C-alpha cells in the first residue's frame, strides 16, 4: 500500500479518504453510497439560478458562482473523514486547489518537507474534507470554496495530475495515473 497519496478533483476525494485511514473496503462503500444517492448530496443554488436568466437576458452582470453550493457534499466528506485535520493523515498527502484571487495553486499537505514550487503555495492548516471539497469544486458547477483568505476551485485547473507536487512534498518514487 502507498505511503503517500495525492489527488486532484475527484481524485482528491480518493486520496483524502485513504489518508484519513479509511479502509479500502469502506471507501468502496462510500463511493457506492454517493453513486446511489448522489442527489441527496447536491444543494442547487436556486436563488442564483433564478437570477441568472433575467440577468443574462438584460445584459446585467451575472453573479452565479456555481449551480451547486457544495455544502451537503462537504458535510458528507467531513462525516467520512471523521472531521480530521490534515496533520492527522496516516500517510503523506497532497491535494491541490486553485485560488481564484491570486491564480496560484494552493496545496493542502501534511508534509513538513514541501519544497518551493513556482506559483504554488503550501498550507498545513485545514480539515481533510475542506481540502477535498475545494479541489473538487469544478468551476461553474460548484461554487468556489472560501477557506481563510483563499477562494478555491478544482485543482485540475492547474495540476490535473499532481504527481510532481507529491514529489515536491518529499515523496519517494511516484506512480501517477492520469485518467
Please place each PLM-identified region on the residue numbering.
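Patatin-like phospholipase
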Residues: 1-8, 16-179
